């Protein structure tokens, strides 16, 4: 029915019929109450069906009426010649077109952000699993992390392994390890595990096991992490014995230790002791009793390995070991340096090159300091002075071909292309 008046008349007619039908239903109910035979019961059923049918019809007609009224309003609505939406506060039209409406109903501002993760709850959850499934999940989220995240983005995935199970009434049931792979719009719970949080907590709990299995994230591999940690114990001991430029030189030879990096680190450890947070101390206690391989000195053989899988902040279990948070910052600077080198040598406009740069250091600094500790920039400078040049010389820059070999190969390519076409040969 296209006519508004026809629909209104139809509703009026059906409402009159409904009044009569309801009266007949009441009469039928009274009759059944006095004489409940089969005929009267059948009549009652028919009366009820008639009332239901009329109510449904009236409901449908009212919906039609509402649609017609809405369509009529839309048709008569005056179009703003300026192209500005009615509720837009601008007096003149913006140069930008109107885009999508972003629904924020699902966002809860009371939920903590990713920077205030409940590390104790996350650590306790990870420690409840056997080591094989944890290390296999770490491999999937570090060595094969990009592929795993790409295939499962926006979902909550479960890792399953035969080594991880629980007995329920005598039946062996798989115990899944849950990890959330959020999108940019996702809001994470304090105890929800994301790939970044997972790498952070597992690297902090099991550095010795990661070292034994040589699990290294690609972003750490390309900055030469394997070479860097090859002789880590000798490297860090030589570093701690070296003279510190930030300490005054001793007057006597017997006091030479007081001007070394080791002495600076001892002073730093005293400062760190004053910054401890109870939740992280509780996590460390839980981890020590749960079989984790923790350390309390940067000279430990596995201390550098807590960064092997590129955690996005210093793992909380090593947060209070002097020099360790700064070591992670040093690695993040190396990642930025390598990306800057790669962007510089690439072909493209200045703007395109800038897009290839990264900000790992800023992200690491912000996330680590949000855990309640300020990084000592002087320690990062010491690392850069002592190890920076060596680290840069071992970057993987995607150019492992010998220059002479490249020249010979390019000459052969140039010759062959000129033989078969008049196009300009590409560079290898």
Swiss-Prot record:
Site (Important for the endonuclease activity): 88, 103
Region (Homomultimerization): 1-79, 100-125, 372-420
Positions of region (Chaperone activity): 1-100
Keyword vocabulary terms for this entry: Chaperone, Coiled coil, Endonuclease, Host cytoplasm, Host Golgi apparatus, Hydrolase, Nuclease, Ribonucleoprotein, RNA-binding, Viral nucleoprotein, Virion
EC number(s) recorded for this UniProt protein: 3.1.-.-
Transmembrane segments: none
Catalytic class of the enzyme: hydrolase
Coiled-coil regions listed: 4-71
Span list, region RdRP binding: 1-50
Domain of life per record: Viruses
Sequence segments annotated as region (Interaction with glycoprotein N): 80-248
Pfam families tied to this protein: Hanta_nucleocap (PF00846)
Motif residue range(s): YxxL: 178-181
Main location as per UniProt: virion
Start and end residues of each stretch annotated as Interaction with host UBE2I/UBC9: 188-191
The keyword Chaperone belongs to this UniProt entry's keyword annotation: yes
Protein name listed in UniProt: Nucleoprotein
Viral RNA-binding, as annotated region: 175-217
Protein function: Encapsidates the genome protecting it from nucleases. The encapsidated genomic RNA is termed the nucleocapsid (NC) and serves as template for transcription and replication. The nucleocapsid has a left-handed helical structure. As a trimer, specifically binds and acts as a chaperone to unwind the panhandle structure formed by the viral RNA (vRNA) termini. Involved in the transcription and replication initiation of vRNA by mediating primer annealing. Plays a role in cap snatching by sequestering capped RNAs in P bodies for use by the viral RdRp during transcription initiation.
Region of interest (Interaction with host DAXX), ranges: 372-428
An example molecular function term from Gene Ontology annotations: RNA binding
